[in-house]
Amino acid sequence: MEERKFGAFAADRPEYVISERKTPRHWYNYFYNERYNAFSSQVGYGEGLLDDELGRRVLLVSDRCVYLTDRKAKTFQTAVGLPMREAFDFYECRHGLGYTTITCEKNGLRSEFTIFVPAEGLFEQWIVRVTNRRDTAADCGLIAYAATESDNPYRPQGYNSEQAHALLEQNLIYSTCLSSALTGHNTLLHPYMATDGAPAAFDTRRTAFLGTYGTKEEPEALLEKGGCTNSETFVEKICYALERDCALRPGESKTFCFQIGVAVTREELSQVGATLRPGEPERLLREVCDRRK
């Protein structure tokens, strides 16, 4: 039987480099601190959750994806190498110690998506670098998306009672949930997604972004409207999606940061921006790498 090779260890750093998207099963890497745990496969699939010493959990992220839209061509592609049926001009996943970076290129647009969990804090951090490798300018949108079960799992005949809203002056969207995971008794928590600049649009309602019959690989908001729809949520299933403007000259690169986490109080929610100041996400990533040397 012929042996098939899906990747190899990097020669210059402690990473395993996966060069084939379609591995026999999801190839996971794990990121964690004392209170927040996450994992991601070679195509971005995975979860993020906070738990306490008794194992009580809040499943904040039940899946994740990053999309790059071409507003002129009215098309979109993912930064995680999905869907499998579509060819990419370049794909690579680097599983490192405490982080994963997925690089994809298609239609002259290259993305580098890095995910990690900092040494402290109830959140995971995403850093996305986009490069225009075309000879012409590109008018793009960059959308970070996370499915969640912080408002309980979806059931076809179930009912969701939570709400989710936007705080655009703080560059974030948030919801609320009751959990005993942090305090030992039911406490109102504030799950959120934030970014390091002004959002162009957002979605918090799952049916507004994915659609009733859409999927992560084909969200109805992107297929029908080309981007997020500015939906807030009242007693429906929640999701988190933030869209950023990404206009690029030929050869230009831009970096965007996103954070998905849980704030225990509204005061903590108002302080999220401190960990998204220029250079801070990169500093947190270096700290993770240094701790694992």
Spans of model-derived segments:
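Anionic coordination/interaction segments
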Residues: M1-K293
